[in-house]
Amino acid sequence: MKLYSYSHCPFCARVKYVAGKLGIKLDDVVLDYDDTETPTKLIGKKMVPILEMDDGTVMSESNEIISLFIELAGSSESNKPTQGAIEWQGGSFAPLLQIGLPRWPLLDLKEFKTESSRIAWEDNKQSIELNFVNLIASTPEIVLQVNGFLIGTEKQLNINNGKTSLSLLDSAIYFSILRGLYCEPTITWPEQLNQWMNYQALESHVPLLR
């Protein structure tokens, strides 16, 4: 099976995380961010992740792809997230975007290798509220908010020696979003949460974004 993805994308990371934890092998194809032709040919629009199966059929919803992986692995894991994970996710995107949007194109990520892809990113993602220059200038204030958010997250996950009782899908949700915050080195990670994140990265073979 072939997965078309971006390295920075939390929904792509979620799919890769589940595949890695279940031992499902994927041919991961990271698209250039300004490549509209490939995804449009596959699903009619520019969106990832896209799973292309061996028989040529495609899937483009991360939840559906994850459900397929759970089924293929014969796993008893639930394909539904808990309400707690859903609510946490709803409050997580603001800090993630404030940190990630101006920084991810500066990392050594395949989707941003070309100047045209970085320009396309800025054109698509920058707004009055999320102005990249202003976000970088506001780093100290944003980091303070993120630090508090991470403390609350660690308490919610009830981590013990780097492990939790989370389901596979809930773990995928938390991990896929939190990994995107590692691109800002001044963020202070609570010890147990940082230990859990690094352990999950090793187990799933999905690296943290730094």
Feature-to-residue mapping (PLM):
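GST-like domain detector, emphasizing the conserved glutathione-binding G-site
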Residues: 1-122, 159-161
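Glycine-centered secondary-structure boundary/capping sites
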Residues: 42-44, 74, 129, 186, ...
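Short secondary-structure transition/capping segments
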Residues: 74-83, 124-135, 206-210
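GST-like fold's C-terminal all-alpha helical module
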Residues: 94-198
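Short, mixed-charge aromatic SLiMs
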Residues: 194-210
